Design a protein with these regions (language model features):
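Short active-site oxyanion
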Residues: 6-8, 77-78
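Conserved, structured core segments of small domains
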Residues: 51-71, 78-81
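Mid-chain, well-packed structural core segment of small domains
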Residues: 71-93
Length: 135
């Protein structure tokens, strides 16, 4: 029997609105500012799809980007996004501010995923899934 029900994944960042907008361009989910500080700065921003929060972004003072694949500030989580064509999706990602990691876990062009960084430095992956037909 489950102890709890999974709710969402939240990413720490210096600017939750900017990071939510970045991921909204990838997913087409709605950006919702959920919590403001006393001076009106967004503290918690959510990506919502059909009324369900999927990803949240939390403002963290003195945020430091993770280093990937190794380094003094290790990644603690990453997101995967399925796409029908890696090359087409990569072109679109780079246009909205993603950075392709200079280090890929394999140099085999037949691999089915690629690693990128979002504007706050979190690594995320595109995963080839040719069964997707609605993008």
């Amino acid at each position: 029997m489950a102890i709890a029900k999974y709710s969402l994944t939240a990413l720490d960042c210096p600017d939750p609105v900017a990071l939510a907008n970045f991921y909204s361009k990838i997913t087409d989910f709605e950006v919702v500012v959920a919590h403001l500080s006393k001076n009106g700065d967004p503290l918690w921003v959510e990506l919502v799809d059909n009324g369900v929060t999927k990803i949240a972004f939390q403002r963290v003072k003195n945020y430091v980007k993770p280093t990937w694949p190794e380094g003094p500030i290790p990644q603690q989580a990453h997101l995967d996004f399925d796409v029908p064509n890696l090359d087409i999706a990569e072109e679109k990602l780079l246009q909205i501010g993603a950075v392709k990691s200079p280090i890929q876990t394999s140099s085999d062009p037949a691999d089915n995923f690629r690693v990128y960084f979002d504007p706050a430095g979190h690594p995320f992956c595109l995963v080839s899934n040719t069964s997707i037909t609605d993008l």
